[in-house]
From Swiss-Prot:
Belongs to the Mediator complex subunit 16 family. This is Mediator of RNA polymerase II transcription subunit 16. Its main location: nucleus. Pfam families: Med16_bridge, Med16_C, Med16_N. It comes from the Eukaryota.
Length: 820
């Protein structure tokens, strides 16, 4: 385990003398599938002293920008449960007074949160919660990991949804367990995100309750996992020293059904066991501290962490097995088959001299590197192998600062580990201390060192493809990727994608481009390739948006639409755009004038892209070898033909409404820039790898005929997944509220001869100029792109375009509010 970075609060040496560990408050942290960490603190992170701003606060932070924490809420009672849904959209918060709230991002900003649903279980201490399973599960087949087809490599697992309504549609909802042995469940209304954003106050939902056991009992720890048949499995324990059942673990099977407009909960007892029956029977006064299912889906194994009076801990793995039990022949219904029963069997154990504070496990069960993590009272972190509980590594959060640092940055002895968690893909391990400070470790190098380079490339590509297919965020893979295999990973990822069937390629095309952009941005030399791929992604989105506006003039023609007819005409490579217009049906491209006017900024971007490709062509062919690796948009025939299709549409629309045409600063008024661009792109598309000298000469003259606008470049970005990360000393020391300057990367902007530069901030969604210093904007936490907070879309076409990026940036990053 390598410490990647730490994020600490600003302060001086005197303010850290207050110790929070004397209070019996539980600290929690949970990582979503989008690699956003939610965590609790008892002080505001913006205050220099832990004593100031005392309360029960919840913060979220993007693991790629850990210096910007955003407060979700401040609670009146201690927080006892913190849980994300599978998509990372809902954040569930439960407290010791029985109040459960569900938060979502306000206005789709990571920096703003609002409570949308509220449920009350008066007086109940919520100790566990789980969202209903949606029945969708995809596994990587380890025996087919060398296959290139996604449909063979990734198999859908037969898994039933937790609650289903009419037609088998999964229901969204939550199951909770309280300390008094109460089960509670409620349904989340199927509201759209737009309707949720309009709520001024949270909707109060009505829950259904039931007893977990026949009689209500007191429990101190609980965990919930999903069964493949749609039920839940609940494991509970009571670590109270005054209880007679302090070393007993009880398990239940819970089924939640929807009956008309209400829910019905049924709880059935499963075999239970005592810790004295296991390998720790010789230890005195074992008290259950934590129970944890090995996996959250269809688990038969349970990790039980206990503390004993000697000051140490005992961790044991129990497995539910089916064993034959001998019975008298008079009681056998079938004499040919033995009578079988379910029993818990102790499989492995681990002992340590300090008490265990927290426990967590890796979340995916098909990974070869599946671990159990333990946080101890002596601030040590232990990583155990899942099956044998053999210790693989051990580290400590104390003394990680440089001894030459200022005293305000030194770790104080009063710090204790508060909570731990691991990301969904298991590559990053997060530790939260009692002052709300973060310690993020890279933990996949333990298995990387054991693999050869070819096997490591295959494993990395498989995980990236799993993210591509499932939609999981791949940030933790990017942060642990070795730079020396980056090119090989990109090559294999691209090769595998192009070997997929056409329908599969079309379905995952945007996800594939987004992933390649993120990979190229990890290296300093890959910035231009990432920029070209970003332009390709925008070009593809504009082409799809424009094609969706076309309507066939003859409704009886179902074979081909206007877009297909246009592509067929362009396949003949006619260089004159006006001759192309003679072969297309103009009525199929007819639209309202206001709609055409609203598309002007997107039309302008297409024209600017065409100008930049052609203006850079002579320089790129003279300084770069044709065998150079990586992506180059000027060599992409599909991209060039997409621009040609758009130029034909723009030409037709310009005849309907000249105000929608792109604006050029040309040397002579009689120059037909659109016609020239189409002609040159047609020539280039015939042989993009080796354009003839005549074409290069014409491209050299292009900056003399028209000013070339500079395409949008993010001037600088500061993030953990920076190209500078391999060149800085680890761990990276970060402070809350201050960007780390050592990771600030300013990409080299290629200057086009005769180009027109612009210092204004450009909206990355609407492609409007926002000025040099706009008062407020939303900025992406991953790529640094900016967009206006205020919607300017007036027509249905532009509103649909804006909705494409309303939730996230085109790089799949989160928007955050930035105020000047």
């Amino acid at each position: 385990m390598d410490l990647l970075y730490t994020t600490v609060r600003k302060g001086n040496a005197n303010t850290f003398s207050f110790t929070e560990t004397q209070h019996n408050f539980e600290f929690l942290c949970n990582t979503s599938s989008c690699n956003v960490l939610a965590f609790t603190t008892t002080n505001e992170l913006t205050e220099p002293s832990p004593i100031q701003g005392w309360g029960f606060h919840i913060y979220v932070v993007d693991l790629n920008a850990p210096w910007f924490p955003y407060r979700v809420t401040s609670n009146k009672y201690p927080i006892s449960v913190l849980q994300w849904d599978v998509l990372g959209r809902y954040l569930l918060v439960g407290d010791r007074n029985g109040h459960v709230q569900i938060f979502v991002q306000k206005d789709n900003l990571l920096s703003e949160w609002k409570s949308v649903y509220s449920v009350k279980f008066p007086g109940e201490n919520i100790i566990a919660a789980a969202f209903f399973h949606n029945g969708r599960k995809l596994n990587l087949q380890t025996d087919k990991k060398d296959q290139y087809l996604y449909l063979e490599k990734f198999q859908k697992v037969k898994f039933a949804a937790s609650v289903r309504q009419f037609g088998g549609v999964p229901v969204e909802g939550v199951l909770i367990v309280s300390a008094t042995g109460m089960l509670g469940a409620f349904v989340i209304p199927p509201e759209s995100n737009a309707n949720i954003q309009k709520l001024s106050e949270p909707i109060k939902l009505v829950p259904v309750t039931e007893s977990l056991a026949v009689t209500r009992n007191y429990y101190t720890t609980a965990d919930i996992c999903y069964g493949k048949n749609g039920y839940f499995r609940v494991a509970v324990g009571n670590g109270d020293s005054k209880s007679a059942n302090s070393n007993m673990i009880q398990c239940f099977r819970v089924a939640v059904k929807q009956r008309e407009e209400t829910l019905e909960i049924n709880s059935t007892a499963l075999p239970s066991f005592f810790l004295a029956e296991g390998m720790g029977k010789d230890l005195k006064e074992l008290r259950v501290a934590h129970v944890q299912w090995v996996f959250s889906e269809d688990a038969d194994s349970l990790i039980v962490a206990s503390n004993h009076t000697g000051g140490g801990c005992f961790v044991e793995q129990w497995e539910l097995t089916e064993e034959s039990t001998p019975i008298h022949k008079l009681f056998q219904s079938n004499k040919n088959e033995p009578f079988k029963t379910l029993l818990w069997v102790s499989k492995s154990q681990y002992m340590y001299t300090s008490k265990v504070i927290k426990i967590c496990t890796t979340k995916l069960n098909f990974l070869s590197s599946s671990f159990v993590y333990l946080a101890m009272s002596d601030n040590s972190i232990h990583c155990l192998q899942r099956d044998t509980l053999k210790r693989l590594t051990c580290t400590n959060i104390v003394s990680i600062r440089d001894p030459n640092d200022h005293s305000s940055k030194q770790i104080k002895l009063g710090l204790k580990i508060g909570a731990i968690d691991v990301t969904h893909l298991g590559h990053l391990f997060v530790t939260l201390d009692t002052f709300g400070q973060l310690y993020v470790y890279r933990c996949n190098f333990m298995c990387q060192d054991q693999l050869g380079t070819p096997a490591l490339i295959v494993q990395t590509v498989n995980l990236l493809e799993y993210c591509l297919v499932t939609g999981l965020d791949s940030l933790d893979i990017l942060l642990t990727l070795k730079t020396q295999i980056l090119e090989n990973v990109l090559e294999r990822l691209t090769e595998n994608f192009h070997r997929q069937p056409p329908n599969v390629q079309q379905y995952y095309y945007v996800n594939f481009l987004t992933m390649k952009i993120a990979l190229y941005r990890l290296s300093i030399s890959g910035q231009q390739k990432a920029h070209d791929l970003s332009n390709l992604l925008i070009l593809h989105s504009i082409l799809i948006a424009f094609k969706s506006l076309l309507r066939p003039s003859d409704l009886t023609s179902h074979d081909k639409g206007p877009a297909e007819n246009l592509a067929m005409v362009l396949s003949e490579s006619v260089p004159d755009v006006d001759k192309v217009l003679l072969n297309v049906e103009a009525k199929e491209f007819t639209m309202e004038r206001p709609t055409l006017q609203s598309l002007q900024q997107l039309i302008q971007w297409v024209a600017d892209l065409a100008l930049n490709i052609l203006a850079k062509l002579p320089e790129s062919r003279s300084f770069m070898s044709n065998k150079s690796q990586g992506y180059d948009i000027s060599k992409d025939i599909i991209a060039l033909n997409s621009i040609r299709e758009l130029l034909v549409m723009i030409r037709i629309w310009g005849l309907l409404n000249p105000q929608c045409l792109p604006v050029f600063s040309r040397s002579a008024d009689n120059l037909d820039i659109l016609g020239t661009l189409f002609r040159l792109l047609t020539k280039l598309s015939l042989n993009p790898n080796e354009p003839d000298d005549l074409l290069l000469d014409e491209c050299c003259l292009l900056p003399n005929q028209v000013l070339i606008p500079q395409l949008q470049y993010v001037p600088s970005r500061t993030m953990i997944a920076s190209p500078l990360l391999p060149h800085v000393t680890l761990p990276v020391m970060c402070d809350y509220g201050v960007e780390n300057e050592s990771l600030k990367f300013c990409p080299e902007v290629p200057i086009v001869e005769g180009g027109l530069s612009n210092d204004n901030v450009i909206d990355s969604v609407m492609y409007l100029q926002l000025g040099r210093r706009p008062p407020s904007l939303r900025r992406c936490t991953r790529c640094g792109s900016c967009s206006s907070v205020v919607s300017v879309a007036k027509t249905a076409a532009m509103k649909a375009w804006e909705q494409r990026w309303i939730d996230k940036c085109r790089c799949n990053g989160f928007w955050r509010l930035e105020v000047a």
